[in-house]
Amino acid sequence: MYIKDKYNMTKNENIFLAKRNIIGSIYNSVKLEGLDITFPETYAIYYKARLEAVNVADVNTVLNLKHAWKYVLCNIDKPITLEYILDVHNEVAKDEAIAWGVLRNGGVGISGTDYRPPIPTKEEVIKKLKEFERISGCTERSVERMLWMMKKQLFWDGNKRTAMLIANKDMISHGKGIITIPEKDIELFGELLSKFYSYDEKDDLKAFIFEKGIDGIVFDKEISHEEPVLE
């Protein structure tokens, strides 16, 4: 299945959308990881409020995502290289994983499936990233790279979060929207992702992402308007 582009915005319009929805994107990401946290708590943590009832590790996860999003938006025009991905993971998994900002160097398992991803090598990852750049459609390229990163498990932890941020970097820089899995659809996404891990079947997963997981704005180009002013 080939995913066509769902939205066509300018880069500045897409950055405006990403900034406006950043807390929602972070909330969906932490719920995807199974964290017991509410949207108001996520909002409060983002704005550095002190919360006694929230686990310290959960607070760290939210703040790491805040910093990772800041890195992506501040470096939106950089090419997606292994070094770029390592920098994003360094923000995502800081003080959470065995190591962060480096490729995994040991074996891991994935809950819910018998699939065991092989240990990644630098040469293999660089080669694969170059192959993705040959895909002309931005949404197709972003989703394919994201799913590959999730299944490959490049890191000890934070793989889904990092993969989705890299996908969003590509999507935003080309004005194609934002990928985020709404809380109400996380269970189905998990089932389809497990099926992909186990059997390498991804058509249903890609169709789901297109229908439920890509957000954007359709602008009336007939109306004259200025580019959104970025903070």
Regions found by a protein language model. Give the residues of each.
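FIC/Doc superfamily catalytic core
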Residues: M1-E231
